[in-house]
A protein has these predicted regions:
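Extracellular/periplasmic carbohydrate-active domains that bind, remodel
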Residues: 2-426
Length: 426
């Protein structure tokens, strides 16, 4: 009897092992490698219990977008280097077609899906040739990078993106995803600015981002409407527009963001460190948002909350008489330490208008916190344990209208010097 059981166990083990398949993506010199992968995916043989491997030592040409089917127990492993087309017009033509899925790499759904890069410093890079786009200030028909959408129980790890054209990772509709040890390098080698190179767009629920490195020209993190239970920690962000909630409420839409923790992050040479942005006329609620243990260096606006957001791409800021605004509740900014960039005449690279899109009426450039709120829309907003200096040696200031919020915000609520209150020191 024992022998029969042992034989059966070995047979079951062998069956399990043999059920897992690996497909190594084929490469043809000078040709688009996407069709070979698409053909393999179309067989259905690699949609479950499979590894899809871009092999180390191979430089793949991803000249057309990749769209994965719904996957179950699949790892996409990028050990080789991947390259977009280096011709702007070629990509624009593809993006302009009705069949373009929205991103160059699209995951359409599934369970237990891993997107894994390489820890080898020379391999596992995805090169989008974004420098040419930035130099040409070309913003028409730009592709997003990676749509990791509708995935339950997912992992994005060890990915390395080099000079992305624009937006990088998005997790719309996904649940229980761990995103860690990824590197995004959207740094211009000329005076051109890498517009809209957002790092991570957190959409979905139960998402953990940690140990990520982002150098870019827009939000390091942006948390969109519908996001719940989001953690972003132990990471480095340089050159961009901060750790952002929103923008929310565009076009009067109803926003819903809850339970976000952002902690242990270094912000360097950024426009913002911690930011909340919602549009005038929006609806809904953002609740229980914490930014904690933030070290900032050469940052223009370390803490910035506005319910009057505006996008310079839409033209001049409109005059709105709307009484609706996205409400905010239980916002905590705790343990912020660093330096404010108040250098006279400094203009951040994304500024293409006069005044700049980020200009705040009455601001001196020395503010550690700006609370741009509407009356009766904000509850329990607290800034505590802040230690900031300006690069010019000037005294640190704040902007806050006491008629818009009745609770103690952790400092004297006025347009003046930063004076912590008891709540800001406890």
């Amino acid at each position: 009897m024992f022998g029969i059981r042992r034989t059966l166990a070995l047979w079951l083990l062998a069956s399990h092992v043999s059920a897992w398949t690996t497909y190594t993506v084929r490469h043809s010199d000078g040709q688009d490698d996407t069709p070979a992968l698409a053909a393999a995916l179309a067989t259905g043989n690699y949609s479950s219990n499979a590894t899809i491997l871009f092999a180390k030592g191979t430089k793949y040409n991803i000249f057309t977008p990749i769209k994965f089917p719904v996957l179950n127990n699949v790892e996409v492993r990028i050990e080789g280097n991947l390259s977009y087309p280096d011709d702007i017009a070629t990509i624009q033509k593809i993006v302009g077609t009705s069949g373009f899925p929205g991103a160059w790499f699209t995951f359409t759904g599934g369970n237990n899906v891993t997107l894994r890069g390489s820890q080898d410093p020379e391999w596992g890079w995805v090169d989008s040739h974004g420098q040419a786009w930035w130099d040409a200030v070309q913003q028409t028909n730009r592709p997003h990078g990676w749509a990791f959408s509708k995935i339950t129980n997912g992992v994005i790890r060890d990915m390395k993106l080099w000079k992305p054209i624009g937006w990088n990772f998005a997790t719309s509709g996904s649940k229980n995803v761990h995103i860690f040890n990824n590197k995004i390098v959207a740094v211009s080698s000329t005076k051109s600015f890498p517009f809209n190179t957002d790092g991570f767009s957190a959409g979905g629920t139960d998402l953990v981002f940690e140990n990520n490195h982002v150098q870019n020209g827009d939000d390091c993190l942006t948390v969109g409407s519908g996001a719940k239970n989001i953690v972003f920690k132990n990471s480095y962000c340089e050159g961009g527009h901060g750790l952002s909630i929103g923008s929310l409420g565009s076009g009067g839409s109803v926003a819903d963001v809850q339970d976000v923790l952002i902690e242990n992050v270094v912000m360097k040479d950024s426009l913002y460190a911690a930011r909340f942005k919602s549009w005038t006329g929006g609806n809904g609620l953002a609740r229980n948002i914490t930014w904690k243990n933030i070290a900032f260096d050469n940052v223009m606006f370390p803490i910035y909350v506005t319910q009057n957001y505006w996008d310079q791409d839409d033209g001049p800021r409109p005059n709105s008489s709307s009484v609706n605004n996205t409400h905010i509740q239980d916002f905590l900014f705790e343990n912020f330490v660093g330096t404010i960039n108040d250098k006279p005449g400094y203009v951040e690279g994304s500024c293409v208008s006069d005044p700049c899109w980020y200009a705040v009426d009455g601001a001196t450039g020395k503010e550690v916190a700006i609370l741009d709120l509407y009356p009766n829309t904000a509850t329990n907003v607290l800034v505590k344990h802040v230690l900031a200096t300006t690069e010019t040696g000037s005294l640190v200031r704040v902007m806050c209208n006491s008629s818009t919020i009745t609770s103690d915000v952790g400092f004297k609520c006025w347009d003046g010097l930063f004076i912590p209150t008891k709540a800001g020191l406890l």
